[in-house]
Amino acid sequence: MGLVIKAALGALVVLLIGVLAKTKNYYIAGLIPLFPTFALIAHYIVASERGIEALRATIIFSMWSIIPYFVYLVSLWYFTGMMRLPAAFVGSVACWGISAWVLIICWIKLH
């Protein structure tokens, strides 16, 4: 898949999030990043370059990768109640990074 197509898909997702954030159903903008646009691209690339077995391993790892995203959401919810938004974002991204790092270390040790 060409780089231009990937960039166009990403731009469309960002535009859709921006439009939805301005509607009365603004919370739907939080659902859009969970649409597997980038997962589809990643899975296609892995399958075409490394084969189905690598794709299946990537799918299992992707299932586990929900944990760092959940950590990000919980920490962002918590931090927005006690600090300014920029600091809450930084703290939440740090929590995501730590939990993603732990996930990768565990995955490497177990596989």
UniProtKB/Swiss-Prot annotation:
It holds the Pfam family GlpM. Its main location: membrane. The keyword Transmembrane applies. InterPro entries: GlpM/YdgC. The chain crosses the membrane at residues 27-47, 59-79, 88-108. Keywords: Cell inner membrane, Cell membrane, Membrane, Transmembrane, Transmembrane helix. It comes from the Bacteria. GO terms for cellular component: plasma membrane. Residues 48-58, 109-111 are periplasmic. It is a multi-pass membrane protein. Residues 1-26, 80-87 are cytoplasmic. The keyword Transmembrane helix applies. It is found in: Cell inner membrane. To P.aeruginosa GlpM. This is Inner membrane protein YdgC. The gene is ydgC.
